[in-house]
Amino acid sequence: MSKYDSHLKCSFCGKSQEQVRKLIAGPGVYICDECVDLCNEILDEELLDTSGAAAQPAPKSEPPQKRRARSSNLSLSQIPKPREIKKYLDEHVIGQDEAKKVLSVAVYNHYKRLAILQSKGSGKNGDDAVELQKSNILLIGPTGCGKTLLAQTLAKILDVPFAVADATTLTEAGYVGEDVENILLRLLQVADLDVEEAQRGIIYIDEIDKIARKSENPSITRDVSGEGVQQALLKMLEGTVANVPPQGGRKHPYQDCIQIDTSNILFICGGAFVGLEKVVDQRGGKKSIGFVQPGEGQSKEKRAADVLRHLEPDDLVKFGMIPEFIGRVPMVAVVDPLDEEALMAILTQPRSALVKQYQKLLKMDNVQLDFKPDALKAIAQEAYRRKTGARALRGIVEELMLDVMYELPSRKDVTRCTVTREMVEKRSTAELLVHPSSLPKPESA
């Protein structure tokens, strides 16, 4: 074996011989055992299609729920109503009624589109003249206000595949980074590589504002992670047949790709769009003739959200989004910033609230954990000052409970912990861990 053999790679997926079980050599090319298996699967699928797939049994490796989803017919009685979807979102996300309504209606209509397409395929629907077009959604709001959580919560209740992608990793084709087709690969993986299921799915693209072009005017240099990505997303948002590399990464000419039709995939985009309210305000006028005047006691964040409710497509263009992209995301919902009251509710009210999580953790050590109302208020006030939304809550509680979580598993004499405002402000929980015998005894009558 020559000294160069250790650098041999599969000509199809690019994996080295150390990463695979077997590497087979041909005239100037190499193929690994994984790619051979993939080719066999593709040939088997084509054989099933030509010989009548309906008469063949489902593969043993296919989950039963996927077989049911593909064989079952969607009907209006099976589709969750917008009120039902919003009610479920209310159990997990505090506030944001407008965004919840927009998402609930969009998801409900997405289900109805799928039901109509299914009935057309079976020949049951005679009204073929009317075609329902999908309405992609844009969520705008500050960091930590629940945009991503809304999407993640939706994923738990939907009977269609749901994937979350990050726009910050995307670049234009041919440059270092991920191609936009990798977004579809995530959806395909959620659907267990079932193309038919993936084509009915929903994709949430987070941090979409990070692909805004760097300036409003065209530049002589290429903006490969901004306008270039927006251009690459256009056809995918509208509906096209995209070639997705099964192993991810960059596409190359000799690679077998999976074709996915995005016409029936619903896209939800979310971003903070920092500074967009200033663009809207400038259009409305200066000082006294602006859209929204500061109310008494109104915070800067709340006023910014009120200003954004007057958003127009031209404002997004000035921010850095191209007109073609905006036209493919017609529904816009503004997500409100979280005030102290909302942050306090987030600590206790959702089904998986932060306080409930810590109570469950300590209960496993036979310790009852309680937070006094003024302690919860102090945590919410500090989180509000940090300006990072609900994400700050976990950091504060983690700092507060570190010593308690460290000591309690080794202590059998502590059965109850009550957190007070003073403990939150001083970041000291030492008195929670004091041995009962060292506490001053009450005077006898």
From Swiss-Prot:
Component of the ClpX-ClpP complex. Forms a hexameric ring that, in the presence of ATP, binds to fourteen ClpP subunits assembled into a disk-like structure with a central cavity, resembling the structure of eukaryotic proteasomes. This is ATP-dependent Clp protease ATP-binding subunit ClpX. GO terms for molecular function: ATP binding; ATP hydrolysis activity; ATP-dependent protein folding chaperone; protein dimerization activity; unfolded protein binding; zinc ion binding. ATP-dependent specificity component of the Clp protease. It directs the protease to specific substrates. Can perform chaperone functions in the absence of ClpP. One of its GO terms (biological process) is proteolysis involved in protein catabolic process. Belongs to the ClpX chaperone family. The keyword Zinc applies.
